[in-house]
Amino acid sequence: MIIAVYGKGGVGKSTTTSNLAVAIAKTGRRVLQIGCDPKSDSTFTIAGRMIPTVVEILDKFNYHYESIEPDDLVVQGYAGVCVVETGGPPAGSGCGGYVVGETVKLLEKLDIMRQYDVILFDVLGDVVCGGFATPLQYADLACIVSSNDFDALFAANRICESIVEKNASGYDVKLAGVIGNRCDQVDLLETFTRRIEAPLMGVVPRNEEVRQSRVKGYTLFELEEMGEPVSEMTGEFRKMAAYLLSQPDGVVPNAVGTREMFELFRGEDLPWKGSNGKTAASTPSVP
């Protein structure tokens, strides 16, 4: 199973993806996480360090693909999760999306991807360009990470549009659902997921331990082993992992028009306004 995780920059995609990867690995699956961001920090909490990127390795071997072995690219980290970082060109030059596409080609050439039960792409995704949309061409399912605010949901909707476009082009990728992250409330998230007709997979509250885990280089599951009070959040990730491993059908989201996005949360019939007594349909939920 291949899962592509998208979301607005800074929304917590990497933290979410890493904890999902560990939750899945703890069920006995072989898991590979591929970081697709020029920052190259997607897998920091799993590897416990910044690992060499594909770009750096290609440069080391003078771009002789035939000289590269799987062990040059893949690092095994916490809970047996294996990780790869694409890296990217220097700031202000080149195309990071192109690097993502070339990384996938290299992993396929080395027959790396077939060695895992579950592969998670952690993808930069404010506005998905062609290169950063490449994982959608390989993925069975996509997940969108969003906080409960307009800018994050606007980016989420653009990702939904990319999923619709990929299906129109013949690719069979479906949206598994939206993951709420750093959420004190979920009103906007629930309105959005109802509108696009997709599940709200789970909600991770705003929490200091989560922020500290990222800084210290630990997943939440490691903090749990250290006795930190994070069991509520690890339980949420276990629930989401179980949902993904059930291989849900997913949906082609009913993406919202750009202009409608600016009106969606201003309507008088939104549940928290309650001015006209309308009751919105329930958000699809994860079993």
UniProtKB/Swiss-Prot annotation:
Pfam entry (one): Fer4_NifH
**Functional pathway:** Porphyrin-containing compound metabolism; bacteriochlorophyll biosynthesis (light-independent)
The record's listing under InterPro entries reads: NifH/chlL_CS (IPR030655), NifH/frxC (IPR000392), P-loop_NTPase (IPR027417), Protochlorophyllide_ATP-bd (IPR005971)
The domain of life for this entry's organism is Bacteria
Offer an example of a GO molecular function term for this protein.
metal ion binding
Any single biological process term in GO: photosynthesis, dark reaction
Entry note: cofactor:
Binds 1 [4Fe-4S] cluster per dimer.
Keyword Methyltransferase (UniProt) = no
Protein residues bound to Mg(2+)? S14
Report the top EC class in one word: oxidoreductase
Which parts of the sequence bind ATP? G10, V11, G12, K13, S14, T15, K39, N181, R182
Supply the EC number(s). Answer: 1.3.7.7
State the family named in the UniProt similarity comment for this chain: Belongs to the NifH/BchL/ChlL family.
Q: How does it assemble?
A: Homodimer. Protochlorophyllide reductase is composed of three subunits; BchL, BchN and BchB.
Q: What is this protein called?
A: Light-independent protochlorophyllide reductase iron-sulfur ATP-binding protein
Specify the taxonomic lineage: Bacteria, Bacillati, Bacillota, Clostridia, Eubacteriales
Gene symbol of the encoding locus: bchL
